[in-house]
């Protein structure tokens, strides 16, 4: 069976979204990820899929790996870079932990190139609906919730401008 979220069309992944293109909602993309990920019944294969998702992440420079961009409360070093251009939020991230980087890659894929309003209204619960929550520590789970809150708080601040 073709996995839509875990095996995106490379041609679509490379191009920039414009406001006239129809993109699935965050909830729909998240549901695809949950379905695709839950179809994989082997933890090592699930882990491999997460690692593959990190290949599409835009790099974070060493200069950007600073305290301002660092997520506190996460066991691993994790940096999130948020920007806003032409009405769209852009997300870049990096971590020294591959599992954290993989999970953040999913979060970034769901939120990147969205309007602040879309991001603010999203309910992200893929960690609870996949075996990922069982595979990561409570601290890492809370760290991922912090990432989601940071992105949504940033988006909320943009809607109040």
Language-model segments: residues:
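N-terminal amphipathic/basic-hydrophobic helices that include classical n-h-c signal peptides
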Residues: 1-18
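A ubiquitous short alpha-helical element
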Residues: 16-20, 88-92
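N-terminal intrinsically disordered, cationic/polar leader segments
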Residues: 23-33, 38-77, 84-85, 89, ...
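Positions in alpha-helical segments
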Residues: 35, 105-106
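A short interface-forming secondary-structure element
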Residues: 95-96
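Short Cys/His-based metal-binding microdomains
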Residues: 100-103
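Alpha-helical support elements that line or immediately flank enzyme active sites
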Residues: 106-114
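Glycine-rich phosphate/pyrophosphate-binding loops
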Residues: 113-130
